[in-house]
C-alpha cells in the first residue's frame, strides 16, 4: 500500500506541494515538488561505499525537461528528447551551486541528483521549484547534508520587490535575481538587471533570503516526518604526525614559492617541492599513501595564502587587497572580423570577436516555456592552452556555457533594440590566458568589440571578480581575484555593470557567516573597481564607431503595402528567389510589410530596393508604362508592366488602323509603351497601344518598370 506524505504551503502568490513515499521508492530519496501546476520530480541516489582513492566529491546534478510536460511531442527524426539543451545545463548548475558547499569536508561518496520536469504551467519557470525539490530530497535521504536550503526568484516591478514573479510579470521587471541559502546564510545568487544600484541589488538578495525561510521550515517539517536514518560515515583520520613532518620540512619553501609572482613559475616551483617531498617519504616507506601527502601539501598552501591575506600582507602576485591587475586593451585586432578586441588583465586574457548577421542567423529556441528567437548570441571558449595544459578540445562544457551566459546577461541591458539595429549579433570570447576572472574579462572585451563593430550600445560594461577570506570575525575582501585566491578563498563574487549601476551578478559562497554588511562592502568595492576599469576602457575606445565594418552586411529597411507581399514572394517563392539571385542580396519579409535587404555592397542593396519598388508600385489608370510583350493571342496581346502585373491589349487597341493579325504588329519580348485604360474588380488590367500614339508623351511620363 502506498502511503504518501505531503507538505503543502503558500509561498508568495504560489502554492508549493512536496510529496514523497509514492514514486521511485528504490532511490535513496524522491520528492515530487510542485509550484502550482509546474511539477518537478527530484530523485537522489547515494553510494554508501566510500572509495578511499577518491580525492574529490563526485556530485552529479542532471536537470531534464520532458516535452510531455507541456503536451507536446518532441521534434526531430527520433521524436524523443536528446542531449541536454543550454537551458537544461544552466538550470543543473543553478541546482548544484548552493548544495555543493553543504556536504561535509572529506565526504567523497558518489551522489546523483536527477530533476525531471513533468508538468509545466507556462507562467512558472521550473528552476526555483527544482532547487526546492533537490533540497527536500537531500533532507529526506539521510545523506550527510547541512541543509535544507530554500530558493527564490526576485523581480523588481513598479519600484517594488516581487517574490517569484510569473513569466508575464518578468516582462516589466527591471531585475531577474535567483537567491538560495540556508536559514542563516546566503550561498548563491544569480542576477540580471537593467542597470540597478548596489543598494537595490542587496535589498533584493535580503528580501529573497528572508522570504524563503518558509520553504526551509516546511522542508524541515517534512524531514522530521519522513526522513531516513542518517548515514554513518567514517572519515579518514588525519595523520597528524605526517602533517607535522611535512609542515616542518616544506612550509618555509612553500611560503617562499608563493613570493613568485608569475603563475607558471610558481606552479613549477610548487610541483617540484611536492615531488621532492613525495620522493623523500616514499624512500622511507614505499606503502605510504601519496594522495595523503598531496592533501597535506595543499592544506599547507591554503593556510599560508589565507594567513598572509588576513595579516594584510601582499597577495600572491604582490598586489594589495584592493588593487586591480595591470590592464592592456586593444581594439580592431582582427582585420576581417566585424569587430574585435584583446583585453588583458594581468595573466588573464580574452580575444573577443563580434559578427553581425541578418535575422536568418538568429537562433530559434524550442523551450518548454515557449518558442523564441534569440538575436544575441554569446559563446565563451576555454581551451586547455589558456592554463598551459593539454586537454580534449570539443563541444563546450558546463562551465563554458555558464560563463558565456553570465557574460551575455551582463550586456543585455545596454544592447540596442532590434528595431533600431536589425542585426543578429554573435560574440565569441576566446580565453587565451587564464588566471582568474576570465568571464569578467570576456565582458570587458565584448563591450569593446561591440563598440569596435559599430553596435550602438547604450554604454560600456565592465566586470570584476571579488573574493573573501574569513576566519572567525576577521575577514578581508579582495578585488580582482586570481585563480588561486578563488580556489583557496571563501567567496567568488562576480559583478558587472556600467557607470550607472549593475547589469549582472553571480555569487557563490562556501561558508556561513557572510553578513549583509560584508556583502554591502563587497558591492561598493566592486563598484570602485568597475569604474576604474571603465575609465581605462574609455581611453582605448570611448564610444561605438560611427559605421559598421566594411565587411559587415548593410541592412536596409523599406515598407510596402502588406497586400503586396504576395507579389514580392511570387508563386512558390519564384520572384523573391529571382531577386536574391540576380541582386546578390538577402531579402527578408515580415507580415507587416517591412522588408529588410542586406548586402555587403551598397549598390546591390539599392538595386534590390529599386526592383522591389517596381514590383510593388501601384498601377494607375491613365498612366503610360513601358512593358514587355509576353504572349500573343488571336484577340490581342498580353503585356507585362511589372512582375505579376500583366494586362491585355485587345486587338482593337493596338493601332488606329484596322489590325488583321496581331503578330504583324507585335512580337514576343518586344518592349512597347502602353496606357492603362481600366483596372477591373479582380485587378485585371485593360491596356492600349493606340491611346499612347494619341497622347503627347514625354520621357518622364513613361514608367520603366518592366523586368
UniProtKB/Swiss-Prot annotation:
The keyword Mitochondrion does not apply. Its cofactor is Mg(2+). GO terms for cellular component: cytosol. It holds the Pfam family RNase_PH. Keywords: Cytoplasm, Magnesium, Metal-binding, Nucleotidyltransferase, RNA-binding, Transferase. GO terms for molecular function: 3'-5'-RNA exonuclease activity; magnesium ion binding; polyribonucleotide nucleotidyltransferase activity; RNA binding. The keyword Disulfide bond does not apply. It is an enzyme of class 2 (transferase). Its EC number is 2.7.7.8. Belongs to the polyribonucleotide nucleotidyltransferase family. Involved in mRNA degradation. Catalyzes the phosphorolysis of single-stranded polyribonucleotides processively in the 3'- to 5'-direction. HAMAP family: PNPase. This is Polyribonucleotide nucleotidyltransferase. It comes from Buchnera aphidicola subsp. Schizaphis graminum (strain Sg). The lineage of its organism: Bacteria, Pseudomonadati, Pseudomonadota, Gammaproteobacteria, Enterobacterales.
